[in-house]
Regions:
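Alpha-helical architecture
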Residues: 80, 111-112
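Conserved SAM-binding loop
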Residues: 112-113, 118
Length: 238
């Protein structure tokens, strides 16, 4: 399943992002796996376009020639930040295992329980922004794979939730105490956290405690984000 997922989603997405002269750009040929989706509707890959909302709002206040330079700068910064967070997370985890810590809860793990997944999401988001605001040659396939990015991100979050369940089984209250002190991915104000988790609390009343709960959670938020994206497409005629 992991291999099939990589071939169908991760590798073609990376190929989409790669520059024309980049040695891995040939991975873009795997985008042909998405053609059945395009047969359903040419805009199906836009069903994750809610990810572009901050930049769509920028278009309302900036002129067209300003948009591209600002967005490219932001995309570069987010991509670089993602690589930094991922590298720090990996280095911290390896050091913790080398020192035989049961729970890695220091350095960057004091601020995020899953910095490696966070780094991947930020890195891929930066690249998603980049391909959405770049010049294409005439006739190029120019629909950013926002739906694929959304699904990939939700898979990463689902894996992180599964790891938390396993850690709680293994370390019990010790890991639960760490969870109370450290945010899941990003430190956010409590009102924002409550807003984000409101749909989950309505459905499950508590955090996911089984694989079934994880599937319900990831499907729920995926459906919500796809619905919001569809509403955005209709409203802005994307």
């Amino acid at each position: 399943l992991a291999v099939l997922g990589s071939v169908a989603m991760y590798l073609p997405t990376f190929g989409y992002f790669a520059s024309a002269m980049f040695f891995l750009a040939g991975l873009g040929v795997l985008r042909t796996l998405w053609l059945p989706l395009l047969e359903i509707s040419p805009t199906v890959l836009k069903l994750g376009c809610i990810a572009y909302l901050p930049f769509l709002l920028l278009e309302l206040i900036l002129e067209e020639h300003q948009i591209y330079s600002v967005v490219q700068l932001v995309a570069t910064a987010i991509t670089g930040l993602g690589l930094l967070v991922f590298t720090l997370g990996t280095a911290t985890w390896l050091y913790g295992k080398f020192e035989k810590h049961e729970i890695v809860d220091f350095w960057i793990y004091k601020y995020s329980r899953h910095p490696q997944y966070l780094g991947f999401i930020l890195w891929s988001y930066g690249l998603l922004i980049y391909v959405g605001y770049k010049d294409y040659i005439r006739g190029a396939f120019r629909v950013p794979p926002t739906l694929i990015w959304l699904i990939t991100t939700m898979i990463a979050i689902g894996v992180a939730l599964h790891e938390e369940i396993e850690m709680k089984k293994k370390y019990g209250k010790k890991y639960e105490e760490y969870c109370r002190k450290t945010p899941f991915m990003i430190p956010l104000p409590k009102p924002i956290v409550n807003t984000i988790t409101a749909p989950l609390k309505l459905l499950l009343k508590e955090h996911p405690r089984s694989m079934k709960d994880i599937i319900v959670t990831t499907v729920l938020y995926t459906v919500i984000l796809i619905t919001l994206s569809y509403m955005l497409i209709l409203a802005l005629k994307l």
